[in-house]
Amino acid sequence: MTTTTHSTAAIMSLLDEAEWRQTQMDVGGLIQASALGKVALRYAVRKLMKRGARLRHDSGLYVCICDPSYEFLQMNLSKISWLERHCPPLDQELIMFGVIEAWEEASVRPTRQLVLFMTPKWDVFAYDSGILFFLAPSMAQFWHGAIVLEYWNALFPVEVRSHVRQHAHTMDDLVMVFHQLDYEKQVLEARRDKNTEGPRTFAKSVNSYVRAILESERRIREGKIPMTFVDRDSLRANSLAHIQATGAQPSHAPAQRVLSAPPSLPSPVSEEDPAAAATPPSSAATTPPSSVVPASVESELSSSPPLPPVVVKDVMYTAGEGDVVQMVVVV
């Protein structure tokens, strides 16, 4: 009985090693094809799709390599073309190379599906629930990076940008977010290795990036796809509905300052009022030159009662109506 158990374990180990080697070869072929261009990438994807290849990501997720002809794809070519035109700063073609799916027992179609795309400039995106998420600036970095679907790396369609402000306005902003997430991921992995091999270190302070990475790892360990918007505070703080509820000015409002009551100005001196002429001009002498106004305006100010101070709340700025995203967020 013991000999049979050891033999089975050895066979399983050999099969796992063979599967790992084949996965590495297939991933290397995809990386090489992506560097050669979109035609080579489409050919490599079609070849792996015929084999039914499912490649393991470093995070533990399995990527089903396929193109838009995949029978269980939950979007069509029209939707892909629409995303290419309505998710700035993306202005390139989206080349589909795989999906990450979640299935429930006896389900006819996937219960959840992440569709993976690559652009001719090697940027990798994931599509989920109407939003594109930037995952990596190249195919090689995608297979070793963190799968995080957060507000910072999201590209909202322009049709909903009057509900939520867009965080990244250029592709460089998205690449910067990727490097920040990758840095936090490497720090966490190095700390775990050090705790295993040597004396324990102090826990790292948990910021929004670390929280998103840890939640993504936890979901993957449970056999689930990482959820979107773990950091709800960032999303809520940039929701225009939340901003209007708190009394802030709309993002397109011009800059304003705190206004005070009008200054106390001397009454105009007329020739028919000699008593007023005899009054020493002490107030006029102490009035700064900036408060001297025309007589007509001065008479209106002196006859109207003083107004209370007007305090203007914080004002936010954007480049225009095209930079704001409207999306109804349920939290």
UniProtKB/Swiss-Prot annotation:
It holds the Pfam family US22. GO terms for cellular component: host cell cytoplasm; host cell nucleus; viral tegument. The keyword Iron does not apply. Coiled coil: none annotated. Residues 275-304 have a biased composition (Low complexity). Residues 246-309 are annotated as: Disordered. InterPro entries: US22-like (IPR003360). It is found in: Host cytoplasm; Host nucleus. Keywords: Host cytoplasm, Host nucleus, Host-virus interaction, Modulation of host cell apoptosis by virus. GO terms for biological process: symbiont-mediated perturbation of host apoptosis. Belongs to the beta-herpesvirinae UL38 protein family. Interacts with host MDM2; this interaction leads to the stabilization of host TP53. Interacts with host TSC2; this interaction prevents host cell stress responses. Interacts with host USP24. This is Apoptosis inhibitor UL38. It comes from Human cytomegalovirus (strain Merlin). The gene is UL38.
